[in-house]
Every structure is written in C-alpha cells, then in structure tokens.
C-alpha cells in the first residue's frame, strides 16, 4: 500500500483538489487513465503545431511552387508593362497589315494578322530566357525560301565568307508568286483580273444618313454562303465593304446590331448591293437564299462620313491605276 501511494504522488493533485473528476479514478483496478484536461490540451496543441510546421516546410522547400506563387503575384504588373510595349509598336503592325491587305486583297483579315504577329513576338521573346545549349526553334510558318536563305547565311558566317548584300526593293514577280503559293495563298495577278471600283455603286454621293447597311456575316448567310465565313468577299470582290473600327463596333454593339466581337473584324455592306446580287442571274431561283437574314439599319452621320472618305480613297486609287496603265496594243 505504501509503495502504491509513493507511486501516485508524482501525479500531482487529484481531480477533486483541482475542482474536477478524473476518469482514471473510476477505471478498473490497476489501470491508470490519464485524462487530465490540461494534458489533453497540451497534446492537441503540439499536434497542431507539428502539422503546421510540416505544411510550411512542404510549401517553401518546393522551388517550383515558390516561384510560381511569386509569378502569380507579379503577373498583373508584368502584363500591363507588356501591353504598354505592344501599344508602342502597334502602329507599325497596323500599317503593315493594311499594306498586306492592299497587296493581296480585301479578303485578308488585318486584325488577325496583327494578333498573329503579336503572338509571334511573344514566342520569340521566350528565347531570351532559353538555355544556351538548347537549339533555337524555328517558326513553323516560315517560308522555305526564307529558311534556305537563313541557313546559307549561318553557314557562311561559320566559314567566314561574307554574302553579297541584297538589293532593297520588291522581289521579282516569279519569286513573289512562288513564295505566296508556298504559303498557301491563292494569288491572282491584279494586272490580269483588276477589281473594278467604279461606276454609280462606287459613288460616295450614294451614301447618306438614310442608306441602309447590313453586316457582312448576315449578307453571307442571306446569299446561301453561311457555312463559309467571308466567302462573299472572295466571290464578289467588287462589292463595297467597310471594315468597322473599334469606335464603330462599340456603337454597333450599343445599338444591338451586333455582338461584341473583341478583336474580330466586322464588315458593313450596303443592303441595296446585296439585294441586287440576289436578283441577278447567279442567285435567281437559288433555294439557299435567305433574305430574311438581312437585318438592315442606318448609321449616324459621323460614321457615314468616314465611309464616304474610304470609298473615295478606293475609287481614286483605281482611277490613278487606270491612268498609269500603259495602253494595250
């Protein structure tokens, strides 16, 4: 009995002395159940502390997670600075895209060309942070002729023999046509098949505030070409079409004439021209005609004025080409 009392002394005050009852007092003989609430709380706090320590260790010892967390915090600021850089050079991309559209044809989507050029810039910028031992990837859409030229330049640079400088200016016609064919573009010489932009349909005076217009996408569906986007522009390049700028698209979206398209192109056509096409021999009796798709609308004076200037520019350009063309013998 005395030994048992000595063994129980280190347990400290009993539950009754602390104002509580220990479950060990009610247990079976010879079994000590430590149910001191203070001990339970101490153990629980230790478990929680150990759990937090392990989680913190996992997060901060993984370099990929740590760097990605930092990148996610800095990404909005980085995006703003990248957008500022692109805005600085956007005027060059816009001029180049418009020049391509003038040379190739009106069916070229200038906005899409700009977006692709910006994405290519970002892809090439990745090479700034690539390993020196890795091979620099080539663009998939580079033309074969350009690839051969660059490879020859690199080989001559290794040999130390300089290449003769190329003369600036437009390449010969046969080279230009072969390059375009390699890129997958259907090229038609303008000298053989000129686009006629003359006559009463190209008279800017016909455009006024009462003139009704339709979206190019709806005109495409109305003439039975809804399955192929932009087919109407390829089949009828003589039609006057106006590419809406961001200000025009904002007004059209506010008036519920079109949905917000973001960076996509939106063309406006004259409703009278579309109905004249539908009544022509090419479409008369066509079962795919859906003229009910033409949801016409009128435009404000400031937009009509821009369309007049645009039509006058195209018409005047064709007149100059007709004057400069040599007489046929």
From Swiss-Prot:
A motif (Nuclear localization signal) lies at residues 164-170. The keyword 4Fe-4S does not apply. Residues 197-316 are annotated as: Important for DNA and nucleosome binding. The lineage of its organism: Eukaryota, Metazoa, Chordata, Craniata, Vertebrata. It comes from Homo sapiens (Human). The N-terminal domain mediates dimerization. The C-terminal domain mediates interaction with DNA and nucleosomes. It contains a HTH motif that mediates recognition of the consensus sequence. This is Deoxynucleotidyltransferase terminal-interacting protein 1. Residues 159-173, 216-237 bind DNA. The gene is DNTTIP1. Keywords: DNA-binding, Nucleus, Phosphoprotein, Transcription, Transcription regulation. Increases DNTT terminal deoxynucleotidyltransferase activity (in vitro). Also acts as a transcriptional regulator, binding to the consensus sequence 5'-GNTGCATG-3' following an AT-tract. Associates with RAB20 promoter and positively regulates its transcription. Binds DNA and nucleosomes; may recruit HDAC1 complexes to nucleosomes or naked DNA. The keyword Phosphoprotein applies.
